[in-house]
Swiss-Prot record:
The keyword Cytoplasm applies. SMART domains: LRR_CC (SM00367). Part of the SCF (SKP1-CUL1-F-box) E3 ubiquitin-protein ligase complex SCF(FBXL15) composed of CUL1, SKP1, RBX1 and FBXL15. It is found in: Cytoplasm. It comes from Rattus norvegicus (Rat). Residues 19-66 form the F-box domain. This is F-box/LRR-repeat protein 15. Disulfide bonds: none annotated. InterPro entries: F-box-like_dom_sf (IPR036047), F-box_dom (IPR001810), Leu-rich_rpt (IPR001611), Leu-rich_rpt_Cys-con_subtyp (IPR006553), LRR_dom_sf (IPR032675), LRR_FXL15/At3g58940/PEG3-like (IPR055411). Transmembrane segments: none annotated. Pathway: Protein modification; protein ubiquitination.
């Protein structure tokens, strides 16, 4: 290995210990580099070939990689260089790569990291069903995945995920507008027992049929986001109240067919709902009107 650079400004003092003289495996990697932000590590590797080797060894041992730590945008060549030796990743987040990330960029990374448990691909619209198939097939421990705003996710892609990911707990399908009730019903029947968090927000194709099937098959469901699901109504919410004792939060803003009586049972259980009761809404409106604020008590 290339020796470290000499100190600038003169020779090293006798007995002095340089950073790279410390044990790499036992000291520098676990106790120093693990605490240095990724962006700073990329700068550090420019100091010398020895530092570059140290940083590459650290990158190869990464358990968590979030491209946002590098910056709001990351070039394809940089991503390839950063992840070329990584074989132990458990968490992978690639949202900053959404403009250019293709199947051929992602699939090799997935193949080298079968231990992945969390993958965030929000907004990665250039991917296809092939990438999701590789993820489902090669990462059996997958627990969390975000596919928000991935328009290419269709019913067939979701079926593959449901069939091959037995540990799935959290799934973000926000704005995956190709998905319809049938696909969500299949997901509920295959993986509902373990699901804890699900977002179906901004999908006008999802209705009460899907919500009711989720309720009946997801006893551990804690968080459900139905924001903007225009076909969801009170029947679906009532079924949630009946079959989901673990539910902690429900998002139904812009679900215009969901009436307050169906939500009241959940409110009494302490479920966090993003729509205020009608009385509270009326009082807030009154407060906004000139002359009423001194007389309105929101605690009524």
């Amino acid at each position: 290995m290339e020796p470290p650079m000499e100190q600038s400004g003169g020779e090293q003092e006798p007995g002095a210990v340089r950073l790279l003289d410390l044990p790499w495996e036992d000291v520098l990697l676990p106790h120093v580099l693990n605490w240095v932000p990724l962006r700073q590590l990329l700068r550090l590797q420019r100091v010398s070939r020895a530092f570059r080797a140290l940083v590459q060894l650290h990158l190869a041992r990464l358990r968590r990689f979030d491209a946002a730590q590098v910056g709001p945008q990351i070039p394809r060549a940089a991503l390839v260089r950063l992840l070329r030796d990584a074989e132990g990743l458990q968490e992978l987040a690639l949202a900053p790569c959404h403009e250019w990330l293709l199947d051929e960029d992602l699939v090799p990374v997935l193949a080298r990291n079968p231990q992945l448990r969390s993958v965030a691909l929000a907004g990665c619209g250039q991917l296809s069903r092939r990438a999701l198939g590789a993820l489902a097939e090669g990462c059996p421990r997958l627990q969390r995945i975000s596919l928000a705003h991935c328009d290419w996710v269709d019913g067939l892609a979701l079926r593959g995920l449901a069939d091959r990911c037995p540990a799935l707990e959290e799934l973000d399908l926000t704005a995956c507008r190709q998905l319809k009730d049938e696909a969500i019903v299949y997901l509920a029947q295959r993986r509902g027992a373990g699901l804890r968090s699900l977002s179906l927000a901004v999908n006008a194709n999802v209705g009460d049929t899907a919500v009711q099937e989720l309720a009946r098959n997801c006893p551990q469901l804690e968080h459900l986001d139905l924001t903007g699901c225009l076909r969801v109504g009170s029947d679906g919410v009532r079924t949630l109240a009946e079959y989901c004792p673990a539910l902690r939060s429900l998002r139904v803003r812009h679900c215009h067919h969901v009436a307050e009586p169906s939500l009241s049972r959940l409110r009494k259980r302490g479920v966090d709902i993003d729509v205020e009761p009608p009385l509270h809404q009326a009082l807030v409106l009154l407060q906004d009107m000139a002359g009423f604020a001194p007389f309105v008590n929101l605690q009524v």
